[in-house]
Curated annotation (Swiss-Prot):
The protein, known as: Depactin
Native species: Asterias amurensis
InterPro entries cross-referenced by the UniProt entry: ADF-H, ADF-H/Gelsolin-like_dom_sf
Lineage, broadest ranks: Eukaryota, Metazoa, Echinodermata, Eleutherozoa, Asterozoa
Gene3D superfamilies the UniProt entry points to: Severin
Domain ADF-H: 3-148
Length: 150
């Protein structure tokens, strides 16, 4: 029997493409969830990608519908933060996040948290990792604290 949860064969390529093509949407993001593949084995798979009209608000709406999920986000600081820290307009910070509501099912939390290492290795080029349990953890201040040189 397989221990842990593997990545779907396309995840690394989809993350690489996400990092390379960040021009199509203002705040691009992707959701990654643990699902069963055709062989009935649990795998981490991209289940939703941001579209042209999506933004941080639509990501929040998606998160409200899920107790536990991973996502990658290309975060762009607000105009105020850019001015304060002399960050050029258009500069973004790709990050990986483990979203786990405080009220989430404990078995589901454990299933996802046991796979964090595998996901981190696949998203290592995104550098910043964030764990969030409520929307305060996804505030600009909280994200800024996690991003180096911010």
């Amino acid at each position: 029997p397989q221990s842990g949860t593997a990545l779907d064969e396309n995840v690394k390529e989809e993350i690489r493409a996400f990092k390379m093509d960040q021009s199509k949407v203002k705040v691009p993001w992707m959701l990654l969830e643990i699902v069963q593949n055709d062989d009935r084995i649990d795998v981490v798979k991209v289940t939703k990608k941001a579209g042209p009209s999506d933004n941080l608000e639509t990501l929040r709406e998606e998160l409200k519908q899920r107790e536990v999920v991973y996502f990658v986000l290309d975060y762009e600081p607000s105009e105020e933060k850019r001015a304060k820290h002399n960050i050029p307009k258009g500069k973004t910070y790709p990050l990986t996040c483990f979203w786990s509501m405080e009220t989430a099912n404990i078995k589901l939390k454990m299933k996802y948290s046991s796979t964090v290492g595998t996901l981190k290795s696949a998203t290592s080029t995104l550098k910043t990792y964030l764990e969030a349990h409520d929307f305060d953890d996804l505030s600009e201040e909280a994200i800024g604290d996690k991003i180096k040189n911010f």
